[in-house]
């Protein structure tokens, strides 16, 4: 029996709907004349716009074939109306060619390389073939090809600048090609003035017979007009174009036929039906048609005239202005109302790229003033009813919500909760106005969409500008409330950097269920409690919440049952069950402490299994004299929670505030989840607001009123300080002042006086803090960290202190004094800006003036800084936006280049780091938790040191079978466990077994560590580039622009803050304060350090010479130099008369022979051979030059300072270590100086380090320098972000700055570069070179409206859920 074959097709015979097409890539090109004509629908030549009946002229600029000219018209090409017709092109034929100003530099570069008669390349044949072979290499990147083409142009232009180049094909003499001067318009000149001998006459004769002679500037320099250049370009071979990296024929770079853009991008606006207002582009095109018509008329005449050239130049300028209205060469024709060109529409902040494509205005948004509301949850935002009635959400009708939506429809748009519109499945819609609402509601069917008012629980996005980091826009749930402001919990102020002094915020309503889901998952407040900058918590309690917590948890706060129960009820919504803890005092009455309130807040009842264990040192922590037990702190500053019970401590900012990884909310988040932390924040906000409202807390003038004792103490301190200052001033005037290292007398005096005056303020501040009552409101706020510091209090109560301008005392702005109220040359504290009064006692007129000087500096600094940091952040974002982590753990950019094999060397997520300095876990705290939750039991075994190590290795193998943990993490964990072994082996613990480690504790500890480490791995698709850029850019706004004193060296000011960050990321070659930190081979001996300093520091002859004088007698004339041996010995300099002689002979400016200099015992005699008549002049000139000759050290080094090494970890047997700080450059020479340890010597100049030590050393320098700057400003940024930035700057083998030239070399796409800076240059360059943009990066995807390939967009492959159809070809063959 024959088996019937069954065939099932893998593909369907046809597909009805393929879905919308996506743009895969963009190919940039230059259109030829034929392509322009093919693309156009109509030829434009008519100068008129409308006829007398206001109908557009045919073949005019408003021809209806190019699209409807206004809203009432119809397109005659596609029959579309104003909304539907995309527009159609026209074309304008020019009678004479003109330069395309966008490609002007390309045209110039081509002309530099070709013969001006036969179009042959001027390059040597061997060089030509070599460069062409490189250019044809398929593996060569477009960036390298551009560089190669530039090298060819540079070679040809260099040859032309040195000599006349003779063409090897036709023998024509080619000179330099350059742009003509701006006053002559737009053109190119050919300069052949370097022709020599008999060639000149021949050349002049040849030029006199050419047409170009009329435009000649001089006989050997003539203008290459576009017609001539067009002919040259047409004769060029394709090989030559390939060598110059021009993808299309070069004649296309010259305009002979122009595209006229469609009317949709240059609409005509009718005003009152009697006149029209035309677009700038239409006005420009009208001028071009007018000029072309004049040119046509002139050319049609039998004889040519100079007028021909003038009209041609006019057309050239008009075409150039049409493309770019800011083009050079048009200054001689100023315009009353400047019209913008095509390029002006694209470039800048208001251009198409940045204003309409990269970002755009959106609907369904609201904006109003913000207010605080502690009764709202941190995940909620209070929205005014008025706003909720305007903003809508399209809800689809289903059987679950039909009745609710019917009621909304009945209510209509003006009654809340209502609806504004109903959309039906057939595409029609009805607006809910009038009396038809009831009928529409009754007819409402499943499948309809109702645009209903915003309701409680709807998902909204909340944003405050400036949006400096990811947490500046987060997702909240709507809570509809009366009044007119947006409200939210104050705990969420930090991420938005919001305050309530009139700030406004924006709100966006996502319009699809997918968008809502994505928003609540990725952008929800509870999922963004920590900042990815360094893993610190950002959403935390602030101000009043901290004050009330501090007061509630005082040792002397007690509550009876009624009061305690009432306070506990403040926390929740009255729905939570609360288990009252055992009272602290039972007799004579049951009393509970304030600390127990926080135990209830953390764990209201037994069903909530939250067990928090933590130790925190608060601001007012003071170590006891014996230092045995921290919990016995006299100020109750040691906060200790054990299993969610507060044992000791007054809670303040360190425990409840932001910026602490060991705070209460951080631990709730890490040990449990974000919900546990959010719930505790909500409870504390409600409790604090209600408690402080009833308890009362205010600040008044009597809080800053000093007592009699304090006033006397302050007066004595100030008088004592003034006396010290006057003594120092007298010492300075007598010349007896002891100088400080590296400083002269005046600077030493300033340093001394500043130190004394700072001591006055500190002394008065201490007296003030100790003299205030503990109930003093400013003191309470300072201690708990809610607002202010001891300095603020001491300025209000005791003494304002020294006012500084640019880090110095008040300068002498008047004649030899700061103000006319003081004597001349006065250095006294009062004359130089010291304010002895407090804000309470009031400032005198002069003190007030000095105080405003200091205040002005702060204001100016802030204003300048805002623009500087904003631009810095934008550059960082553009450079790093494409970087993401892939599934193979590598960090790559949009084009697939690997920047890091593992993100941050360990693949950890910075937002989840628990330890200091980016460590994944805090082992001490974790072990404390394990000890609390897993106490020793009778069946547990205590481990000795050896058993501990052995058990650890076993547990590690058991829990980390897949080897997820890195070697560095395992090493740090092993070190911690070994330290536990040392502790448990000490005698007291062995005796009592109180701090011993049991087997169960170790097992649980290792398990938790491995599990948590695994959880902290960064997810594939994370946009780490964007996060890194924001993490570096956002702290920049908090920095100052001032310079700081270098670490430990008062005399050495180095650039810090925003200017220093800019220097680093710009990869500046010449930084403002280059410093080399040089380690010594013998760091313990100061004499040795001074000797090495003498070898490095630049020393001039004038510094070590006792005298330099001219000796003239009747028989001889010479210059005698006497060296000062005392100075040479004190400075440990190795300078001798012989070494001075060699230095003089090596100086290029002084032309002396060996015989002219005679060495004496203590100096030299210089007798130059000169003409007697000029001897006097020459010797005095030599005398003036000699003091500046460098006789010792490195010439690029300005100064060397010997300083104490402040790093205590490097000290040997407690002895002081010395090092050198070298102010200047030439790292290589410093490293090679005898006595310097070159292996540990570093520089802060990134480019110099790169040249001296290589690219890896430069990468390390970038990381270290950014870390140092941030550290000096008290900011911590995860090192992984800095490593990523350093890798981006160095991954191509050279240090690339994060600015326009550096980003250009970073293999970025055309659209990205065009959206950054120099829009026109990048687009024209891409077109000339025929570049292809593959739409891979973030900017390109946003511009094209395509999902970007990061985050969820990284997924490319999906698992098939259906089985593939099987192909049945009958039974298997029987093989015999």
Curated annotation (Swiss-Prot):
Keywords, in A-Z order: DNA-directed RNA polymerase, Magnesium, Metal-binding, Nucleotidyltransferase, Nucleus, Transcription, Transferase, Zinc
Subcellular localization(s) per the UniProt record: Nucleus
Residues bound to Mg(2+): 499, 501, 503
One example of a Gene Ontology biological process annotation: DNA-templated transcription
Top-level taxon in the UniProt lineage: Eukaryota
Catalytic activity entry: RNA(n) + a ribonucleoside 5'-triphosphate = RNA(n+1) + diphosphate
Alphabetical list of Gene3D superfamilies matching this protein: 1.10.132.30, 1.10.150.390, 2.40.40.20, 6.10.250.2940, 6.20.50.80, RNA polymerase ii, RNA polymerase II, clamp domain, RNA polymerase Rpb1, domain 3
Matching Pfam families: RNA_pol_Rpb1_1 (PF04997), RNA_pol_Rpb1_2 (PF00623), RNA_pol_Rpb1_3 (PF04983), RNA_pol_Rpb1_4 (PF05000), RNA_pol_Rpb1_5 (PF04998)
InterPro entries on file: RNA_pol_asu (IPR000722), RNA_pol_N (IPR006592), RNA_pol_Rpb1_1 (IPR007080), RNA_pol_Rpb1_3 (IPR007066), RNA_pol_Rpb1_3_sf (IPR042102), RNA_pol_Rpb1_4 (IPR007083), RNA_pol_Rpb1_5 (IPR007081), RNA_pol_Rpb1_clamp_domain (IPR044893)
Class in the EC hierarchy, top level: transferase
Region (Bridging helix): 845-857
Amino acids binding Zn(2+) 1: 75, 78, 85, 88
Gene Ontology molecular function, alphabetical: DNA binding; DNA-directed RNA polymerase activity; metal ion binding
E.C. number(s) listed in UniProt: 2.7.7.6
Transmembrane segments: none
GO CC, alphabetical: DNA-directed RNA polymerase complex; mitochondrion; nucleus; plastid
List of residues binding Zn(2+) 2: 115, 118, 170
Main subcellular location: nucleus
CDD domains: RNAP_III_Rpc1_C (cd02736), RNAP_III_RPC1_N (cd02583)
Annotated SMART domains: RPOLA_N
Family recorded in the similarity comment: Belongs to the RNA polymerase beta' chain family.
Assembly behavior: Component of the RNA polymerase III (Pol III) complex consisting of 17 subunits.
Record's function text: DNA-dependent RNA polymerase catalyzes the transcription of DNA into RNA using the four ribonucleoside triphosphates as substrates. Largest and catalytic core component of RNA polymerase III which synthesizes small RNAs, such as 5S rRNA and tRNAs. Forms the polymerase active center together with the second largest subunit. A single-stranded DNA template strand of the promoter is positioned within the central active site cleft of Pol III.
Name the UniProt record assigns to this protein: DNA-directed RNA polymerase III subunit 1
Annotated organism of origin: Arabidopsis thaliana
């Amino acid at each position: 029996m024959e088996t019937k074959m069954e065939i099932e097709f893998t593909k369907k015979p046809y597909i009805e709907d393929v879905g919308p097409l996506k743009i895969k890539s963009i190919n940039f090109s230059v259109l030829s004349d034929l392509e322009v004509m093919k693309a156009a629908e109509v030829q434009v030549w008519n100068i008129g716009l409308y006829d007398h009946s206001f109908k557009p002229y045919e073949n005019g600029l408003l021809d209806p074939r190019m699209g409807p000219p206004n809203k009432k018209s119809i397109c005659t090409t596609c029959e579309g109306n104003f909304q539907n017709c995309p527009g159609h092109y026209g074309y304008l034929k020019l009678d004479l060619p003109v330069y395309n100003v966008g490609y002007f530099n390309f045209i110039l570069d081509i002309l530099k390389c070709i013969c001006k008669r036969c179009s042959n390349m001027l390059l040597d044949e061997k060089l030509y073939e070599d460069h062409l072979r490189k250019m044809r290499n398929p593996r060569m990147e477009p960036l390298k090809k551009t560089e190669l083409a530039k090298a060819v142009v540079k070679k040809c232009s260099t040859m032309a600048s040195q000599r006349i180049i003779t063409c090897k094909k036709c023998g024509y003499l080619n000179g330099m090609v350059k742009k003509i001067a701006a006053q002559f318009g737009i053109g190119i000149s050919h300069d052949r003035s370097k022709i020599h001998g008999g060639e000149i006459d021949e050349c002049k004769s040849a030029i006199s017979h050419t047409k170009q002679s009329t435009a000649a500037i001089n006989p050997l320099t003539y203008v290459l007009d576009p017609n001539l250049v067009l002919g040259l370009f047409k004769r060029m071979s394709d090989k030559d174009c390939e060598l110059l990296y021009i993808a299309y024929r070069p004649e296309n770079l010259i305009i002979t036929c122009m595209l006229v853009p469609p009317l949709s991008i240059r609409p005509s606006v009718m005003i009152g039906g009697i006149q029209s207002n035309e677009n700038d582009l239409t006005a420009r095109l009208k001028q071009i048609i007018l000029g072309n018509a004049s040119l046509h008329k002139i050319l049609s005449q039998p004889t040519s005239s100079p007028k021909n050239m003038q009209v041609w130049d006019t057309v050239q300028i008009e075409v150039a202005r049409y493309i770019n209205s800011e083009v050079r060469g048009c200054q001689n024709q100023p315009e009353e109302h400047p019209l913008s060109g095509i390029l002006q529409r694209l470039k800048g902040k208001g251009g198409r790229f940045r204003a309409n494509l990269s970002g755009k205005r959106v609907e369904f948004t609201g904006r109003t003033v913000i207010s605080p509301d502690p009764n709202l949850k941190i995940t909620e935002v209070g929205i005014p009813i008025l706003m909720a009635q305007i903003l809508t959400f399209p809800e689809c009708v289903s059987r679950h919500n039909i009745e609710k939506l019917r009621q909304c429809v009945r209510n209509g748009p003006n009654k809340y909760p209502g609806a504004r519109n109903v959309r039906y499945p057939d595409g029609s819609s009805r607006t809910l106005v009038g009396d038809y609402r009831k009928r529409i509601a009754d007819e409402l069917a499943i499948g309809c969409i109702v645009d209903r008012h915003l309701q409680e629980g709807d998902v909204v996005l909340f944003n405050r500008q400036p949006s400096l980091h990811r947490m500046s826009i987060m997702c909240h749930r709507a809570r509809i409330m009366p009044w007119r402001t947006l409200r939210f919990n104050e705990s969420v102020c930090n991420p938005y950097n919001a305050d309530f002094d009139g700030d406004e915020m924006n709100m966006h309503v996502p319009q699809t269920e997918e968008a809502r889901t994505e928003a609540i998952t990725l952008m929800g407040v509870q999922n963004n409690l920590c900042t990815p900058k360094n893993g610190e918590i950002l959403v935390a309690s602030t101000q009043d919440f901290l004050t009330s917590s501090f007061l509630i948890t005082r040792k002397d706060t007690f509550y009876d049952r009624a009061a305690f129960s009432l306070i506990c009820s403040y926390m929740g919504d009255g729905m939570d069950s609360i288990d009252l803890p055992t009272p602290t005092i039972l007799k004579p009455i049951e009393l509970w402490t304030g600390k127990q309130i926080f135990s209830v807040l953390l764990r209201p009842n037994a069903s909530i299994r939250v067990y928090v264990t933590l130790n925190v040192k608060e601001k007012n922590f003071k170590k006891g004299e014996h230092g045995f037990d921290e919990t016995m702190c006299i100020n109750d500053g040691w906060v200790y929670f054990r299993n969610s019970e507060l044992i000791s401590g007054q809670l303040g900012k360190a425990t409840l505030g932001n910026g602490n990884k060991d705070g209460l909310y951080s631990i709730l988040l890490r040990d449990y989840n974000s919900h546990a932390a959010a719930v505790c924040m909500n409870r504390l906000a409600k409790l604090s607001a209600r408690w402080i409202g009833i308890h009362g807390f205010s600040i008044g003038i009597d809080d800053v009123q000093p007592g009699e004792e304090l006033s006397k103490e302050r007066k004595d301190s100030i008088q004592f300080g003034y006396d010290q200052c006057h003594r120092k001033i007298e010492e300075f005037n007598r010349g007896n002042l002891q100088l400080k290292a590296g400083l002269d007398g005046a600077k030493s005096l300033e340093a001394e006086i500043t130190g004394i005056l700072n001591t006055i303020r500190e002394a008065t501040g201490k007296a003030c803090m100790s003299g205030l009552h503990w109930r003093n409101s400013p003191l309470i706020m300072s201690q708990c960290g809610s607002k202010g510091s001891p300095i603020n209090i001491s300025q209000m109560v005791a003494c304002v202190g020294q006012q500084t301008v640019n880090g110095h005392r008040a300068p002498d702005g008047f004649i030899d004094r700061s103000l006319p109220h003081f004597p001349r040359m006065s250095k006294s504290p009062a004359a130089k800006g010291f304010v002895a009064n407090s804000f309470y006692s009031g400032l005198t007129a002069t003190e007030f003036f000095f105080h405003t000087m200091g205040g002005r500096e702060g204001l100016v600094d802030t204003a300048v800084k805002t623009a500087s940091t904003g631009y810095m952040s934008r550059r960082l974002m553009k450079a790093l936006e494409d970087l993401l982590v892939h599934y193979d753990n590598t960090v790559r950019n949009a084009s697939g280049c690997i920047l890091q094999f593992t993100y941050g060397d360990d693949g950890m997520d910075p937002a989840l780091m628990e330890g200091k300095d980016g460590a994944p876990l805090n082992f001490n705290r974790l072990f404390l938790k394990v000890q609390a939750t897993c106490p020793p039991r009778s069946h547990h075994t205590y481990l000795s040191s050896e058993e501990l190590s052995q058990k650890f290795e076993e547990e590690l193998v058991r829990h980390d079978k897949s080897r997820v943990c890195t070697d560095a993490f395992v090493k740090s964990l092993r070190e911690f466990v070994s330290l536990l072994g040392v502790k448990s082996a000490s005698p007291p613990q062995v005796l009592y077994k109180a701090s011993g480690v049991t087997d169960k504790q170790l097992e649980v500890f290792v398990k938790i560590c491995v599990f948590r480490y695994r959880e902290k791995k960064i997810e594939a698709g994370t946009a780490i580039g964007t996060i890194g850029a924001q993490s570096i850019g956002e702290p920049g706004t908090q920095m100052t622009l001032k310079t700081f004193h270098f670490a430990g060296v008062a005399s050495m000011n180095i650039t810090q803050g925003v200017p220093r960050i800019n220097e680093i990321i710009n990869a500046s070659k010449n930084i403002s304060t280059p410093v080399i930190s040089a380690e010594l081979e013998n760091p313990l001996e100061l004499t040795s350090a001074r000797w090495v300093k003498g070898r490095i520091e630049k020393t001039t002859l004038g510094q070590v010479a006792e005298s330099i004088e001219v000796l003239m007698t009747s028989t001889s004339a010479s210059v005698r130099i006497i060296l000062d041996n005392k100075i040479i010995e004190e400075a440990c300099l190795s300078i001798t008369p012989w070494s001075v002689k060699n230095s003089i002979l090596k100086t290029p400016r002084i032309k002396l022979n060996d015989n002219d200099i005679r060495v004496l015992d203590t100096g030299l005699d210089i007798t130059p051979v000169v003409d007697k008549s000029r001897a006097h002049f020459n010797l005095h000139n030599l005398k003036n030059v000699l003091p500046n000759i460098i006789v010792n050290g490195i010439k690029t080094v300005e100064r060397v300072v010997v300083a104490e090494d402040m790093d205590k970890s490097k000290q040997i047997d407690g002895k002081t270590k010395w090092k050198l700080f070298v102010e200047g450059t030439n790292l290589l020479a410093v490293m090679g100086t005898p006595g310097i340890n070159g292996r540990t010597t570093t520089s802060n100049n990134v480019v110099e380090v790169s040249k001296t030590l290589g690219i890896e050393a430069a990468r390390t320098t970038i990381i270290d320098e950014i870390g140092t700057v941030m550290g000096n400003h008290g900011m911590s940024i995860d090192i992984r972000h800095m490593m990523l930035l350093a890798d981006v700057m160095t991954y191509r083998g050279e240090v690339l700055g994060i600015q326009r030239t550096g980003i250009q070399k970073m293999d970025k796409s055309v659209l990205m570069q065009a959206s950054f800076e120099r829009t026109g240059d990048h687009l024209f360059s891409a077109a000339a070179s025929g570049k292809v943009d593959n739409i891979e990066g973030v900017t390109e995807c946003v511009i094209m409206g395509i999902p970007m390939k990061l985050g969820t967009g990284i997924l490319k492959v999906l698992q098939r859920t259906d089985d593939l159809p099987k192909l049945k070809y009958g039974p298997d063959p029987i093989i015999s």
